[in-house]
Structures are given as structure tokens and as C-alpha cells.
Amino acid sequence: MDRINFETLNIEYYENVNLSDYCTWKSGCNVPYIFYPKNINELKTLLNLKCKKYIIGNGSNTLFISLKNTIVISTKKMKSIIFEGEILKVECGASLSLVMSKCLNNGLTGFEFSTGIPGTIGGALITNAGANGGTISDNLISVSILD
């Protein structure tokens, strides 16, 4: 990995991390750095770095193998949920259980299918997660992505 002064980024990170605590399977390898961006701008900064990157959310159903010379970016702190009437804008790191709870507290239904799914919105979108007769795509209007 090229020399990058990560301290100048002002983004929370940790060095020499074993990923077994970051996935539901408790399997892991050691990585030189794990970063926790709090917003889209911090995520963009990390994605623009000239090094190998691996992005994780909750680590649900993830098996980590060798990630030598790779930085890990955890989206766990990107969990903003904004209500605009009956429309939600949700960041990728928000857990499905948090989104469901917020929906129910605001009188919105349709997301109950996610009960018991341990993942995040980001992971649910990638896999079209579903259970109990419903999927994430059933209530989806649009997705914004970073290219």
C-alpha cells in the first residue's frame, strides 16, 4: 500500500484490526486500517484514495479472507434517516431494524418484512433482501449510487 497520511483525512479510523468482530460468522483476517465515514463526503474522500478498498456494512453473511494491503470502509456510521412525508431517505449504513422501528413510530407500514434480518439498507439493496413474503424492492422508489 502506498504511503498515505490518513491522519490528515480527519475521518475516524483504526489500525491493525482483526475483522472477526465485524461479521456475523466471526471469521476474519487482519487489515491494516478500517475507516468509519459519517457522511457521503467522507465516503467520497475514502473512495478517491489510490489504494485497494473493501466496503462493509453490518458484516451480515460476510466471510473475510485475505485483504492484505486493503483498507476496509465500514458504513456503520452512515445511518441517517430522513422522513419527507411518506418517503424516506436512508443512508446505506442504517440497520433494517432501525428503519423498521422508525417507520412504525411514524405510522408507516410495509417494511415489517425486514423483522429479524440483521443487515443494513446498503446490503439489503445489493441482495434484494427479503423475508416474510416481502423484499426491499417492494417499497423502493429510487437509489443513489457513487460511481
Where are these regions (language model features)?
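Residue-level signal for beta-strand positions within conserved beta-sheet cores that form or flank
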Residues: 9, 86, 139
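FAD-binding glycine-rich core of flavoenzymes that anchor FAD
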Residues: 40-45, 49-54, 77-124, 146
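Short secondary-structure boundary/hinge segments and terminal tails
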Residues: 24, 64-65, 120-122
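Structural signature of FAD isoalloxazine-binding scaffolds in flavoprotein oxidoreductases
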Residues: 28, 34-40, 63-80, 126-147
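Short, functionally important structural connectors and interaction interfaces within domains
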Residues: 11-19, 23, 56, 73, ...
